[in-house]
Swiss-Prot record:
Modified residues (N6,N6-dimethyllysine): 455
Variant or mutagenesis effect after changing residue 41 to G: Weak effect on methyltransferase activity
Organism lineage string: Eukaryota, Fungi, Dikarya, Ascomycota, Taphrinomycotina
Domain Chromo, chain residue ranges per copy: 8-69
Positions contributing to Zn(2+) 3 binding: 268, 307, 313, 317
Location of N6-methyllysine modifications: 127, 455, 464
Protein name: Histone-lysine N-methyltransferase, H3 lysine-9 specific
Gene3D superfamilies in the record: 2.40.50.40, SET domain
Chemical reaction(s) catalysed: L-lysyl(9)-[histone H3] + 3 S-adenosyl-L-methionine = N(6),N(6),N(6)-trimethyl-L-lysyl(9)-[histone H3] + 3 S-adenosyl-L-homocysteine + 3 H(+); N(6)-methyl-L-lysyl(9)-[histone H3] + S-adenosyl-L-methionine = N(6),N(6)-dimethyl-L-lysyl(9)-[histone H3] + S-adenosyl-L-homocysteine + H(+); N(6),N(6)-dimethyl-L-lysyl(9)-[histone H3] + S-adenosyl-L-methionine = N(6),N(6),N(6)-trimethyl-L-lysyl(9)-[histone H3] + S-adenosyl-L-homocysteine + H(+); L-lysyl-[protein] + S-adenosyl-L-methionine = N(6)-methyl-L-lysyl-[protein] + S-adenosyl-L-homocysteine + H(+)
Domain Pre-SET residue range list: 258-325
SMART domains documented for this protein: CHROMO (SM00298), PostSET (SM00508), PreSET (SM00468), SET (SM00317)
Effect of residue 378 to S: Abolishes methyltransferase activity
Subcellular location: Nucleus; Cytoplasm, Cytoskeleton, Microtubule organizing center, Spindle pole body; Chromosome
Molecular function GO labels: double-stranded DNA binding; histone H3K9 methyltransferase activity; histone H3K9 monomethyltransferase activity; histone H3K9 trimethyltransferase activity; histone H3K9me2 methyltransferase activity; histone methyltransferase activity; histone reader activity; methyltransferase activity
Length: 490
């Protein structure tokens, strides 16, 4: 017998959105014992068992319409007939800056579309219905109705009469939603797990995401969308500056670490690689991974050995390129067919370090669980840390936490590749996944890598290349390159 699922009660409907024909397409639900930040937009079909809630909302609208027909009423519906809304926007745009008018117009366009947000669409496609409980439901009219009655010039008797009506409505609804008369609704859904940003406007969502970008370390990362009216990628995504170790992941043991004794002033001597103990894992270290400009050499294998905190050299050492971080300003932008992508705002010569692939470091067991869920969605952000052991202990998951690299798209003809950068030489289960340019990249050129692993980016064939976990689903490739394979993971 499965455990009983926790249910959540609807307190009231607080708003609605109409389609172009004036029909209701979404209701904004206030959940009992939850704040307005947990409000969710639900389609009418999800309220099939909440006739009392709908009836009260309709009564409230009629009452407000009768008491104040002026469109400036504080309780005027958020999405009136499209024509009237657009007219209102036109009237107010004269005193609003151009940038804000543009964001408002996009917001109006978005609200008038007969589709949900991306997250809502996914929930509907998977046929997950909202938990709307009618047992002992309390319908509480908005307190602002009482306050607003004073603004409308109502007498004390009228206010008292409204209070009595509210009590009568509440009692009648409790009776109507008793177990004897309530219908059985669809399976419950936890409001706290839903998109908590649906109440924000286009402008607010975009600015909130840009605020996240401003907090990223290093050169600026900007956001632009010249394709459609999606304000930004998911606001639930959190940017991090280093790996986020999860339960069961063992961090490197400092007792097993060692470093080199290279110069503390100029750092390692690029012309004398045999002196640096950090390269001892190479059979015959003939050169460092980097040249004098800090670019990865064309003859470098898939693994880069950098210095670490136990070395005598400083952070300015020429063998600490990845550790010094990103030097290129980047831009997250909306592509026409591939969702969000990333491009460089400056010219990047071949060999330039771009950034690292970050995320949660999870165990192989946890990765297996998540991999199944991600395959259901048709997408995965998992990278196995298996460069030194095919049976990898850990995997990097950038689904919810990560770097700008999380938005890198695939290409069958990529301009960047991923290297395994090791600096904890006695501990190879966790290492950096570092992106470098493998050809000259022009300003505003999209940064792409081969999701299946670039087999030929290095002339050194004795080492395998790092690749992300292969999805079980074949997906059509939209990279558009001349040598496109046609399918991802196929």
């Amino acid at each position: 017998m499965s455990p009983k699922q926790e249910e959540y009660e609807v307190e009231r409907i607080v708003d609605e959105k109409l389609d172009r024909n004036g029909a209701v397409k979404l209701y904004r639900i206030r959940w009992l014992n939850y704040s307005s930040r947990s409000d969710t937009w639900e389609p009418p079909e999800n309220l099939s068992g909440c006739s009392a809630v709908l009836a009260e909302w309709k009564r409230r609208k009629r009452r407000l319409k009768g008491s104040n027909s002026d469109s400036d009423s504080p309780h005027h519906a958020s999405n009136p007939h499209p024509n009237s809304r657009q007219k209102h926007q036109h009237q107010t745009s004269k005193s609003v800056p151009r940038s804000q008018r543009f964001s408002r117009e996009l917001n109006v366009k978005k609200e008038n579309k007969k589709v949900f947000s991306s997250q809502t669409t996914k929930r509907q496609s998977r046929k997950q219905s909202t938990a709307l409980t009618t047992n002992d439901t309390s319908i509480i009219l908005d307190d602002s109705l009482h306050t607003n009655s004073k603004k409308l010039g109502k007498t004390r008797n009228e206010v008292k009469e409204e209070s009595q009506k509210r009590e009568l409505v509440s009692n009648s609804i409790k009776e109507a939603t008793s177990p004897k008369t309530s219908s059985i609704l669809t399976k419950p859904r936890n409001p706290s797990k839903l998109d908590s940003y649906t109440h924000l406007s286009f402008y607010e969502k975009r600015e909130l995401f840009r605020k996240k970008l401003r907090e990223i370390e290093g050169p600026e990362v900007t956001l632009v969308n010249e394709v459609d009216d999606e304000p930004c990628p998911s606001l639930d995504f959190q940017f991090i500056s280093q790996y986020r170790l999860t339960q069961g992941v063992i961090p490197p043991d400092p007792n097993f670490q060692s470093g080199c004794n290279c110069s503390s002033l100029g750092g390692c001597d690029l012309n004398n690689p045999s002196r640096c103990e950090c390269l001892d894992d190479l059979d015959e270290p003939t050169h460092f991974a980097y040249d004098a400009q800090g670019r990865v050499r064309a003859d470098t294998g898939a693994v880069i050995y950098e210095c670490n905190s136990f070395c005598s050299c400083s952070m300015e050492c020429p063998n600490r390129v990845v550790q010094r971080g990103r030097t290129l300003p980047l831009e997250i932008f909306k592509t026409k067919e591939k969702g969000w992508g990333v491009r460089s705002l400056r010219f990047a010569p071949a060999g330039t370090f771009i950034t690292c692939y970050l995320g949660e470091v999870i165990t192989s067991a946890e990765a297996a669980k998540r991999d199944k869920n991600y395959d259901d969605d048709g997408i995965t952000y998992l990278f196995d840390l298996d460069m030194f052991d095919d049976a990898s202990e850990y995997t990097v998951d950038a689904q919810n936490y990560g770097d700008v690299s999380r938005f890198f798209n695939h290409s069958c003809s990529p301009n960047i590749a991923i290297y395994s950068a090791v600096r904890n030489h006695g501990f190879r289960t966790i290492y950096d996944l570092a992106f470098f340019a493998i050809k000259d990249i022009q300003p505003l050129e999209e940064l792409t890598f081969d999701y299946a692993g670039a087999k030929d980016f290095s002339p050194v064939q004795s080492q395998k290349s790092q690749q992300n976990r292969i999805s079980k689903l074949r997906r059509q490739c939209k990279c558009g390159s001349a040598n496109c394979r046609g399918w991802l993971f196929g």
